[in-house]
Amino acid sequence: MISCGARLAVFDIAELREVTAYDELELDTLGDRKTALFLIMSDTDDSFNFLISMCYTQLFNLLCEKADDVYGGRLPVHVRCLIDEAANIGQIPRLEKLVATIRSREISACLVLQAQSQLKAIYKDNADTIIGNMDTSIFLGGKEPTTLKELAAVLGKETIDTYNTGESRGRETSHSLNYQKLGKELMSQDELAVMDGGKCILQLRGVRPFLSDKYDITKHRSEERRVGKVCRSRWSPYH
């Protein structure tokens, strides 16, 4: 009882009780039509971060039930969850099972982390299961040793040709030439740590990892429309 009381003590705050007293998000409707829902939390105070985790838990459960009971197993509109700073919202219960089952219901989850070790710190042994159930992973850069080590292993090795020449001098001069093939890491840990900031490494299921340029978001059509509106709103014939 003491442990339960300590965990629920946060609901002694009247404002929090008011926020959670009624369902105003209608999470079960997200797969019915195109909708954007933003869950924003403080990046300096994690006291209420568990609310985000609760929302995702309810979201996955409600949408899976609706997909099965109403739409025959697949939602009419794909629901994509972009979970930025996923390590800061706490643990989403049964995430290792959810990431493997929600995809068939037209639901996907994109976990954004600073380092792979963050996921292991929260989900322990289940972290590898979560990573293994992700069809796509992208490395944007970083220096965390565990991430670099595992990525270097995934990239594999390339074959290089080496030639060694030797010369000995004495009464008679002799020369030697040795040729052999060696395996070299495609990108070593130190190379990954200093990777160009404009590059990324993308891994797709069934495809070998490849190096690619990061997308310039300023060239996206929605960004061009936004900038155009800002420019028009600031224009004045008297300038």
Task: Give the location of each predicted region.
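P-loop NTPase motor domains
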Residues: 1-107, 122, 190-214, 220, ...
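P-loop NTPase motor core of the ASCE superfamily
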Residues: 28, 34-35, 97-100, 118-226
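Short, glycine/acidic-enriched loop or turn micro-motifs at the edges of active sites
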Residues: 87-88, 117, 232
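H-loop/switch region of ABC-family ATPase nucleotide-binding domains
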Residues: 113
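Positively charged, low-complexity/disordered segments
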Residues: 224, 228-239
